[in-house]
Regions:
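Non-heme Fe(II) oxygenase catalytic core, chiefly the N-lobe of the double-stranded beta-helix
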Residues: 1-191, 198-254
Length: 254
């Protein structure tokens, strides 16, 4: 369980701070067994709308260097178009894939991406296009060159240089981030929001990262499922699979 909050801890009370939105990403796609599904259980959301434009926060842009300096302006304008009331922004990579020309779809179906956590890692090749084994619907799995900025090594398309990879994936990201594929979810207490990491990108909004008023409080719990989704019940996780892919103290009662 991952806690998403801006509630202050027990340390020194600091002045209110603003944080820009993050990179568009999927959760933990850089591991050999990625997260398939994520969900938010919402406890508390901001109710303040004190900014002059009637939103919780102003339009806070990332600092220089957040994205690659050669990223085109059209792409960056779509990246920075984020909600300002504490919503989570989503983009539908399944519909975006379906709208591509058939020849482009065939090209992408053959595309392999090398993902890795650190630049020094050899990494592993994974398909850029994911096919849902139950519905057969295809989607783009994390079509982003550098989804964690400097924190995680950029991906590389098999057979492409770094520059070719960035330009190719920037074009796909710009396609996916069109408004017709976007959905911004305004959380309410008690909401359970579930999404597929294979079929969406998402982005955390600009937030007040240090708060001075309870009206600005934001508290959600993120729960995630790892590995290929099971479409048959009961799911039978073997001890070997759990030992290789899940950190203690997880246990399966199946």
């Amino acid at each position: 369980v991952y806690v998403v909050t801006n509630l202050p801890g027990s340390g020194k009370n600091e002045e209110e701070q603003l944080a820009s939105g993050l990179h568009w990403h999927t959760d933990i796609e850089f591991e050999p067994v990625p997260l398939s599904t994520s969900m938010f259980y919402v406890q508390c959301v901001p109710i303040s709308r004190e900014h002059q434009n009637g939103t919780w926060v102003p339009d806070v842009r990332p600092a220089d260097g957040f994205y690659h300096p050669d990223s085109n302006k059209d792409l960056n304008s779509r990246r920075f178009d984020l909600p300002l009331n504490g919503e989570t922004a989503y983009a539908d990579t399944a519909s975006a894939f379906e709208d591509l020309p058939k020849e482009k779809q065939k090209e992408l179906e053959k595309t392999q991406v090398r993902r890795r956590l650190r630049v020094s890692d050899a990494g592993w090749l994974t398909p850029l296009v994911y096919r849902n084994p139950r519905t057969g619907r295809q989607s783009l799995h994390s079509p982003v060159w550098a989804s964690r900025g400097k924190n995680v090594a950029p991906v590389q398309i098999d057979g492409f240089s770094e520059t070719q990879t960035r330009e190719y994936l920037d074009e796909l990201e710009a396609h996916v981030l069109q408004q017709k594929y976007r959905y911004d979810h305004l959380h309410q207490p008690g909401d359970v929001t579930i999404w597929s990491n294979f079929a969406t990108l998402h982005n955390a909004p600009p937030v007040k990262s240090k708060i001075c008023s309870p009206e600005d409080a934001r508290l959600m719990y993120r729960i995630s499922c790892k590995g290929e989704p099971s479409y048959h019940l009961p799911r039978k996780d073997t001890d070997e699979w759990l030992a290789a892919n899940i950190s203690p103290p997880y246990q399966s009662n199946i």
